[in-house]
Regions:
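Acidic (Asp/Glu)-rich catalytic clusters
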Residues: 4-7, 26-33, 51-59, 80-84, ...
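N-terminal basic/disordered segments at the start of proteins
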Residues: 9, 13-21
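Conserved anion-binding
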Residues: 12-13, 70, 74-156, 160-165, ...
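Conserved, mostly hydrophobic/aromatic
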Residues: 15, 38, 67, 90, ...
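Alpha-helix N-cap and loop-to-helix initiation/capping positions
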Residues: 23, 130-141, 188-195, 219-223
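Metabolite-binding pocket within alpha/beta catalytic cores that recognizes anionic/polar moieties
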Residues: 37-89
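Hydrophobic beta-strand scaffold residues
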Residues: 62-63, 114, 176, 208
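Glycine-rich phosphate-binding active-site loops on the catalytic face of alpha/beta enzymes
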Residues: 85-100, 190-223
Length: 228
């Protein structure tokens, strides 16, 4: 039994596959039958490529997280290739600008959507200062990038659990996927702006991204069902 969705609804959790390809199949077997999707990021994609993405997309809801950020023509071409892989959602950096974002909504379908990345959940005020951002408040930066993406037709967003409530209130019909989710008592690892799964869902998150608290848990199947 696969975890593929029977409609355009996204699964409540995407399990982050930040691992080598050899570790993927055992984990899929452990989580078989659960209503989860899988996030394929740079580590796994650069090891195994588009073939793995296409194979997994036949049976599972896939979130391809490559955070496209380049000149508009390059991003448009890459995005068109991704749209044909069968994935459900994929990411672009909102900081790429309006010209980069504006052409993407035309590539969306009922079962495929772009998500604008605002501020990474690992970033703090000091990190923004290091980038030369004049307003180093992460929430203000998130709001600015949210406005930019929304004004260019993007309705899906990646944001931390701390910002999702306010953004969801501004765009109730939007898609909001939140990384930086840690069950109560779990290690924060390299995340800074975090919340529990229950807090994130109550704040308006459409789906959660959870990696190490599931993949490195003694019982990954039980961890994948922990929504507290």
């Amino acid at each position: 039994m696969s975890s593929q969705q029977t409609s355009s609804a996204l699964p409540p959790v995407f399990v982050a596959l930040d691992m080598n390809e050899g570790a993927v199949s055992p984990l899929l077997g452990t989580l078989d039958g659960l209503n989860v999707g899988y996030k394929i990021g740079m580590e796994l994609f650069y090891q195994s490529g588009a073939d793995l993405v296409r194979r997994m997309a036949q049976d599972h809801a896939i979130f391809l997280d490559l955070k496209l950020h380049d000149i508009p023509n390059t991003v448009q071409s890459a995005a068109a290739r991704i749209a044909d892989m069968g994935v459900r959602v994929t990411t672009v950096h909102a900081a790429g600008g309006g010209a980069m974002l504006a052409g993407l909504p035309a590539l969306e379908r009922d079962d495929f959507q772009f998500l604008a990345v605002t501020v990474l959940t690992s970033m703090k005020a000091e990190d923004l200062r290091g980038l030369g951002v004049s307003d180093d408040n992460p929430q203000n930066r998130v709001q600015h990038l949210f406005n930019l993406a929304r004004d260019n037709g993007i309705t899906g967003f990646i944001c931390s659990p701390l910002e999702v409530e306010g953004l969801h209130a501004e765009l109730p019909s939007g898609t909001f996927i939140t990384p930086g989710v840690r069950p109560a008592g779990a290690s924060l690892d390299d995340q800074n702006r975090v919340a529990t799964p229950l807090q994130a869902k109550q704040s308006g998150a459409t789906s959660l991204v959870i990696g190490r608290p599931i993949t490195r848990a003694p019982d990954p199947r039980a961890a994948a069902q922990d929504r507290k």
